[in-house]
Amino acid sequence: MKKIAALIPARGGSKGVPHKNIRKLCGYPLILYSIAACKFCKEIDDIFISTDDREIADIAEKYGAKVPFLRPKKYAGDNSTDYQYLKHFFSKIDVDEVALIRPTTPLRNPVLVGGFIEKYFKTKEQLTSLRSMHELSESPYKFFKINDKGYCEGFFEDYEGIKDYTNLPRQSFPKAYHPNGYIDIIKKETINTGHTYGDKIYPVVTGYVTEIDTLYELKIIENELKISGNLLIDLLQYDGKELIIA
């Protein structure tokens, strides 16, 4: 079985939800859900954290992740890009690719993650990256922006020559997908070309995923966990695994 290192990006300066990456979700720091998913995924053999924040680093290390260095602050601002911290990571750690596991998507099935990793290794020579996504209920062709004059305006000039395309039935448009952070696989080779994902992105489609960018979304996931439970919660509460629980 081929294995891969995981990288969890967790900067300290979240504005929407202060201290988001270590905020408690049903009693556990948010970042722990992603660490746990990696620990319980047999295709992942190492877990790294990219953070500029010492407190986040200490908590991550407590739960068994590696923080061999802190991310430079210049790569951890509101306008910093994934490419910047990924290039920095690959310059420090000698791996060919990483599974990018974003802590803002906490509810993952480790078996599903492993299946996506297996798919990557079967076709990696033909890909520049792998990216998870879920289907949108509405096409971007149904979306509006508000123009400088204060009126609604579609994002596109037309659809197949039709100007008034926003009133077409949604079935008229191709399916659209939203990247959701469940798992991405980033290749050092692609980063070295100056791109994060490249032009041959392999899609893996999940069910709908709630990402945490606001307190409201945090509450949604917390309520979901309280009502339905989750595999990771069960695994975290099981003491037969080598995972330290505070």
Q: Which ranges hold each PLM region?
A:
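Hydrophobic targeting segments
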Residues: 3-8, 31, 46-49
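Conserved core of the sugar-phosphate nucleotidyltransferase
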Residues: 106-199, 204-206
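Conserved SAM-binding loop
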Residues: 23-24, 49, 100
